[in-house]
Structure formats: structure tokens, C-alpha cells
């Protein structure tokens, strides 16, 4: 598979094209230092042979923000060094920290915006980023990634909503690009041109008056022109449309743009790859071979391979899918695709982040703070002597499935096929009952269930049930009228 072939980024050989993008874990303390829980989270990705591990955003400054990692002074270097060393000792995975600057927000809903920053503030931000990238090199990381996506400072300067009136102002593209350009220049000067530096930014902001892929293509070209070593594309995640809950700090993933940043199960798969492909094609047409990473509901290996093999993107960044199963790359390489624990995009992880709780996956065993260690020798669950005894009842606009418990099962995957024969994983649950409310009356559906261990060994499929939701009364009366006309 092309997906599992190495890629070189500014001299750095990354063993495969699977990346885990930065995801907040909320495992650190308020002090921002690396602790054992943080190390354990990222070592699991290395155990699964993820090609490029991007450590969650760590701040270049000391502003209060809750449990967020820091790289704002030299006191953080020993802990960061230990993290990088532990990952390198585990496998040949490469690791970079994502480096962030954020503006102030308050529980009242007030937030600082880029027009409130003085030129001295901007100069300080430039220096802080450069110093942080230099510390990343000192700590033994393989590179660094600048966070210029979503709701944060670098992204806010890039946005068309930037209302500054000076040389950093949003009225011109060059004004919006000035800060990120200076940051990269300073990082190169302090960390060296041979130290890989990537940038994560939005392909589309998905807010009123925000920029779209048309701007993102030009932003990407400028980043390539000034020597950025890889481009990682996200979308949305803005404060402008965030839903503010009384007494809580605004969370930029609660509005529509936040949904687009972390699309739930109601969104189609491969949600944003077309943006990344368009941006890569534009950059390449202008003479640059800068690697491009995409993200957005990409945990299906066939989708990931298609994007990379076709040259649409160079790297596939899988966030929630690798949180659910850090061993995803290893299992795919070993021909154990059936053992991959498929993310069902329930977004429990997103909810935990938004409520300032430690981020885990709902598919892990109850009470687990980390994904369970892989156990290839574990035995698959077995249905009892009477099988799964899967039953389905239809009524009140939904179909209800029930089945018997399989000893040794950590979860059950519910699969559904429509009349066209398209089969998909609908959900993964820990109980023996499930409701499907997204069904069309008068359509015949087919369901089955499989039981899985915590490390992905699957049972044989349950018995298959076929069920049809009765048509609503308005539909039956219409059908009778049509029959009368026909007769």
C-alpha cells in the first residue's frame, strides 16, 4: 500500500503516511508539564506504528488556560525531552509538537481579538514562536508544527475577519500573511533550516465573511514559497459562531464551523479531502512539491489508500480513528484489518474536551484512561448456544434491535444494509440494545451485529434480521388515492 510507504519531509524519513494530528487530551496539569498520563497516550501511538505523531497543542506563553501543555520556557524542556525519547525508544514513529499562541477568553463570553494587540505584542509573539521551535529541537523532537488553524492567534490573523488597519490588517491578503511569514522566518533563524517545520491551517473557515478554499490555495502557495516543509489542512473551529453557555469559557467547536472541524456520524466519510486535493494541485501547478496532509472522517483504510495512491494528498491525518485504535497502522500492515476498532464518530471525545474533562474514547473498556494494549492472541467472543438471537421491532419512527450478550465482548458493532445493498457500520455500543431513528418508512433494512474484544477480535456475525418501518398515515392515504386514480 502506498499509504504505508515512507515519505521524506526536509530530510526526515517518516515511516508511513499515517499521521495522528494534534488532539487535546486534557491529561496535563494546570502547570503544563508533561506527566506519565501524557507519555502513555503518545507512546500508544508509537506502539501502533503511526508514521507521524503530532503532540497536542502546547503554548508559547504562560496565559492561564487550564490543562494545556507548555513550551514557553526552558523549564518545560526536560519533560518534553522525556516524551520524545520514550516515543523514539518505542518505534520508528516520528514526533513533532504542535505549537500554539491563543488570545484571552472569559466566562462572560468576552474574548480578545487581533485588533487589540499592539505592535509590541506582535513582536513578542514572533519571538515566542521562534523560541518554542528552538526548544522543540533541543528536546529531541523531529520537527515542529505551527498551529494556524481554527480559533487561535495565527489563524485569526489569516482570517478575512481580521479587522486590523495596519500592515497586519485583513483588508489585504499580504497583510493577513505577514504574521505567519515573520513567525516562520524567526523559527528558521533560531532552530535552523534543516529542522522540519509544518503549518496546520484551515482550508475553509466555514463562517460568515471567513475565507474559503480560494484563499486557502493562495495561503498554501505562500507557505510553500517561504519553505514550510508540510501543509496540514483542517477546517472551521471558530469562535465567531460558537455557542456560548452561561458561565462557561467559550468553546470554538460548538457552532457549525465546529461541526465541520470534527464532523459527527451524520456527516459523510472523507468530509474534507477534496479541499486538500485542490490545494495540493494548486501548489504543485505553481512548481512546489510541498507534502499535504488531509483530515476529516478518514478511518477507513480504503479511503486513505485511495487518496494517497492517486496523489491527491501525501499524508492522511486520522484523529478520532487513531484515538479509538492506536494500532490501526500496525493492524493494516499485518493484514488484520478486521481487528481494527472502527471509530463510530459519536463525538464523546469532543464533548469531553468541550466540558474540560480528560479526553478518552467511548469504545475503550469502562474506566480506561488509555487505549488497551494490543493482544493479538486474545480469543474472539462467542455467541451462546442459541446464537445472538437478534430481533428487530419497528414502530414510532424507529427500529429497535435487541440481542443476547456474548461472553468476553467489550463492544458490539451494529451494521445495516439498505435496499441498494450498501452495508455500513452504524454504531458501536457496549449494551445489547440499539435504536435506529434514521430510517425511511416503507424501506426494507437488513441488520446484523458482531461482538468484539477490547483489542478487536470479532465474533461471527449474528443472525440477520430484515425489517421495514410501517408507512406514516399521510403516506398510506396518499397511496390509496393513487390506487383509486389508477383503477
Language-model-detected regions and their locations in the chain:
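Recognizes extended acidic, P/S/T-rich segments that occur
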Residues: 413-442, 454-461
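Pro/Thr/Ser/Gly-rich low-complexity, intrinsically disordered linker/stalk tracts
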Residues: 377-408, 441, 454-487
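Short coil/turn motifs at secondary-structure junctions
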Residues: 102-104, 204, 408, 419, ...
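Flavin-dependent oxidoreductase catalytic cores
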Residues: 1-380, 385
Amino acid at each position: 500500500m502506498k499509504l504505508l510507504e515512507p515519505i521524506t519531509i526536509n530530510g526526515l524519513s517518516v515511516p508511513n503516511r499515517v499521521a495522528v494530528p494534534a488532539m487535546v487530551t486534557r491529561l496535563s496539569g494546570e502547570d503544563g508539564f508533561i506527566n506519565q498520563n501524557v507519555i502513555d497516550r503518545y507512546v500508544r501511538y508509537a506502539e501502533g506504528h503511526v508514521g507521524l505523531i503530532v503532540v497536542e497543542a502546547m503554548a508559547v506563553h504562560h496565559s492561564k488556560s487550564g490543562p494545556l501543555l507548555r513550551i514557553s520556557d526552558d523549564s518545560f524542556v526536560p519533560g518534553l525531552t522525556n516524551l520524545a525519547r520514550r516515543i523514539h525508544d518505542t518505534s520508528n514513529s516520528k514526533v513533532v509538537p504542535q505549537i500554539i499562541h491563543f488570545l484571552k477568553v472569559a466566562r462572560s463570553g468576552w474574548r480578545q481579538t487581533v485588533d487589540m494587540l499592539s505592535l509590541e505584542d506582535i513582536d513578542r509573539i514572533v519571538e515566542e514562536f521562534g523560541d518554542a521551535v528552538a526548544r522543540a529541537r533541543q528536546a529531541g523532537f523531529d520537527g515542529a508544527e505551527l498551529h494556524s488553524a481554527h480559533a487561535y492567534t495565527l489563524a485569526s490573523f489569516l482570517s478575512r475577519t481580521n479587522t486590523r488597519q495596519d500592515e497586519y490588517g485583513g483588508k489585504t491578503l499580504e497583510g493577513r500573511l505577514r504574521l505567519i511569514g515573520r513567525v516562520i522566518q524567526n523559527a528558521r533563524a533560531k532552530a535552523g533550516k534543516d529542522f522540519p517545520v509544518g503549518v496546520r491551517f484551515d482550508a475553509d473557515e466555514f463562517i460568515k465573511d471567513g475565507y474559503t478554499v480560494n484563499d486557502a490555495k493562495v495561503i498554501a502557495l505562500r507557505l510553500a514559497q517561504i519553505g514550510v516543509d508540510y501543509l496540514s489542512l483542517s477546517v472551521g473551529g471558530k469562535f465567531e459562531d460558537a455557542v456560548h453557555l452561561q458561565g462557561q469559557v467559550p468553546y470554538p467547536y460548538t457552532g457549525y464551523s465546529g461541526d465541520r472541524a470534527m464532523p459527527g456520524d451524520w456527516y459523510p466519510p472523507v468530509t474534507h479531502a477534496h479541499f486538500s486535493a485542490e490545494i495540493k494541485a494548486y501548489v504543485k501547478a505553481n512548481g512546489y512539491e510541498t507534502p499535504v496532509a488531509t483530515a476529516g472522517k478518514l478511518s477507513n483504510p480504503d479511503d486513505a489508500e485511495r487518496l494517497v495512491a492517486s496523489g491527491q494528498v501525501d499524508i492522511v491525518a486520522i484523529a478520532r480513528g487513531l484515538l479509538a485504535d492506536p494500532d490501526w497502522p500496525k493492524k493494516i500492515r499485518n493484514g488484520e484489518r478486521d481487528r481494527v476498532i472502527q471509530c463510530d464518530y459519536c463525538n464523546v471525545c469532543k464533548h469531553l474536551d468541550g466540558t474540560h474533562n480528560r479526553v478518552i474514547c467511548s469504545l475503550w473498556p469502562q474506566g480506561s484512561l488509555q487505549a488497551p494494549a494490543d493482544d493479538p492472541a486474545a480469543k474472539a467472543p462467542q455467541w451462546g448456544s442459541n446464537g445472538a438471537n437478534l430481533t428487530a421491532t419497528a414502530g414510532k419512527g424507529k427500529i429497535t434491535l435487541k440481542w443476547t450478550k456474548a461472553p468476553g465482548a467489550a463492544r458490539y458493532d451494529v451494521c445495516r444494509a439498505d435496499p441498494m445493498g450498501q452495508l455500513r457500520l452504524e454504531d458501536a455500543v457496549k449494551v445489547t440494545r440499539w435504536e435506529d431513528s434514521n430510517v425511511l418508512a416503507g424501506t426494507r433494512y437488513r441488520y446484523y451485529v458482531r461482538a468484539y474484544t477490547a483489542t478487536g477480535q470479532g465474533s461471527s456475525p449474528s443472525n440477520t434480521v430484515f425489517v421495514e418501518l410501517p408507512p406514516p398515515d399521510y403516506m398510506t392515504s396518499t397511496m390509496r388515492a393513487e390506487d383509486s386514480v389508477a383503477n
